[in-house]
Swiss-Prot record:
Lineage summary: Eukaryota, Metazoa, Chordata, Craniata, Vertebrata
InterPro entries xrefs: C2orf80 (IPR038776)
Start and end residues of each stretch annotated as Disordered: 155-193
Short name of any one Pfam family annotated for the protein: DUF5563
Biased composition annotated in UniProt, kind: Polar residues: 176-186
Official protein name in the record: Uncharacterized protein C2orf80
């Protein structure tokens, strides 16, 4: 039992050390260096650790209360509510994704036209009912983007099939109407006297 606890503590300490080292090594205040995949992973790790601290209701947050007591009333920080914290977490991860995904891909996912591709066909938007809005589900955004792409392809196929069947039905009705008109023109008209 004690061995497991020591192993668990060592894992935690190593994880914390590696995370801190990554952040220290990747610190670039002037922003001259190009971001790499490791940078994105360090940002992702930081976002997840912050999210877990903020969203875990069993976490002992007495240090926040103690900090509030030391600060005078007019300078007391107002900590955001749960929804605002989730929004902050999502916006930080969205920034990471926006830096790693080309903007054209983002426009394709959401069905908007970029200025460079103004002649392309708009992609129909996926209904937001089938996508999860929970922060930890949204943190798997690349998978969500792939899912949205698949759904938009499916919806495009359905709309083209509907359009094709409606056009063929209209054409069939039009040819039927024309043939009935020709048939009525060839029939002798009977006058009732």
């Amino acid at each position: 039992m004690e061995r497991r606890l020591i192993k668990k503590e060592m894992k935690k300490l190593l994880g914390d050390y590696i995370g801190i080292r990554l952040r220290e090594n990747e610190f670039d205040p002037k922003g001259r260096r190009q971001l790499t995949f490791l940078d994105d992973m360090a940002h992702y790790d930081l976002a997840i650790s912050v999210a877990l601290q903020w969203l875990d209701p069993s976490e002992d947050l007495t240090w926040l209360e103690w900090e509030e007591l030391k600060i005078p009333l007019h300078g007391r920080p107002i900590y955001p509510n749960r929804r605002e914290r989730e929004a902050m977490i999502l916006s930080s991860y969205a920034g990471i994704l926006m830096n790693s995904i080309p903007i054209e891909e983002v426009f394709k996912i959401y069905g908007a036209d970029s200025s460079a591709d103004s002649g392309t066909i708009k992609v129909p938007r996926v209904s937001s009912l089938c996508l999860s809005l929970h922060p930890f589900a949204m943190l798997t955004a690349p998978k969500a983007a792939a899912y949205a792409r698949k759904q938009s392809v499916k919806s495009r196929k359905v709309t083209t099939n509907k359009n094709a069947t409606s056009i063929s039905a209209k054409e069939a009705n039009a040819t039927e109407w024309k043939s009935s008109q020709r048939f009525s023109d060839t029939q002798p008209k009977h006058k009732v006297t």
